Amino acid sequence: MGAQVRLPPGEPCQEGYVLSLVCPNSSQAWCEITNVSQLLASPVLYTDLNSSINKLSISANVENKYSLYVGLVLAVSSSIFIGSSFILKKKGLLQLASKGITRAGQGGHSYLKEWLWWVGLLSMGVGEAANFAAYAFAPATLVTPLGALSVLISAILSSYFLNEHLNIHGKIGCILSILGSTVMVIHAPQEEEVTSLHEMEMKLRDPGFISFAVIVTVISLVLILIVAPKKGQTNILVYISICSLIGAFSVSSVKGLGIAIKELIEWKPVYKHPLVFVLLAVLVLSVTTQINYLNKALDTFNTSIVTPIYYVFFTSMVVTCSAILFQEWYGMTAGDIIGTLSGFFTIIIGIFLLHAFKNTDITWSELTSTAKKEAVSLNVSENNYVLLENLECSAPGYNDDVTLFSRTDD
């Protein structure tokens, strides 16, 4: 009889569960639990078991924190590259428009010959790769909100390189977006609910997610085939809605492929699992569709409008998909849920300020001078009000005297 094998915290100890063991000769064995029995109440064994569990728990906590920090760094790097890619691609599209070539918003694909557009695409590819890796280390509810940083970077760079003005409202909106993202990071779940391809497959087979996927697919097809040809050039929400709806599938695919890569590093035969190829096909199709319609949105509308609205729609879809598929919200307390929602609504308010007042040319000096003028006018009006009040107070006294005098005569 060999030594006892203790499962780390979080691993289910139930019949039929398959686990991986590393043998002394550097080989790997797969074991299936066939019988589960209770341990005898031995004080020595109980103490030894508690000690081992505590060590494993501490090790698991350290590993979770390490993974969380790695995911945060990758997510921030992703936002920097993606935010820059919007500017580079827009710059390339503007250069093509100045040459009189058919624009992407009109169905043209001449941007494929513009090197600056390719630099932007490469920057977006690096950002998406970092984002891809971030989903393997941290929950989707934590990684996705950090995309608000791309809004900030895109807004700042567009004011410098595209001559798109960023007023005081836009700056306040950027700050609110960062604060909202920080709140969401603090209250986001810090443990992954799906850690293997088998669990991922079970989640994908859930009736709730299947219904969600069918509804999103039908809406996307209606927008692509019917609405986009008629309203795409005049309504910014059409192209962005397509990108956001399809983006929900891309994030789910990225999460699953990230889990597959982690299992591949652990020498598990994931290449034999058909789910890997299904996720890869969905990822390629969804990313291709996103790039196509995002190009049309950027070429047709202002970058400072496209970026924030795309962020709000995309984040909403990802959070919804994450809640349905990965069920990360089930492990959160009521306070964390309220904090996450508050942070997200703070981001939306910041995005609204960035978008709604973008054509309002107001500076900080104008705001301060206006406040001073209002204070002076308020003091003048208060003095006039006091003077009128004194006159009004004296008038009734005079009338009373006259009335009293007339009554005396009577």
UniProtKB/Swiss-Prot annotation:
Cellular localization per UniProt: Golgi apparatus membrane
Keywords, in A-Z order: Glycoprotein, Golgi apparatus, Ion transport, Magnesium, Membrane, Transmembrane, Transmembrane helix, Transport
Catalytic activity: Mg(2+)(in) = Mg(2+)(out)
Entry-linked SUPFAM superfamilies: Multidrug resistance efflux transporter EmrE (SSF103481)
Alphabetized GO MF terms: magnesium ion transmembrane transporter activity
Principal location class: Golgi
GO cellular component: Golgi apparatus; Golgi membrane
Claim: Membrane is one of the keywords in the record: yes
Glycan attachment residues as annotated in the record: 25, 35, 50
UniProt keyword Ribonucleoprotein, yes or no: no
Protein role: Acts as a Mg(2+) transporter. Can also transport other divalent cations such as Fe(2+), Sr(2+), Ba(2+), Mn(2+), Cu(2+) and Co(2+) but to a much less extent than Mg(2+).
Name the record gives this protein: Magnesium transporter NIPA3
Organism annotation: Pongo abelii (Sumatran orangutan)
This protein's encoding gene: NIPAL1
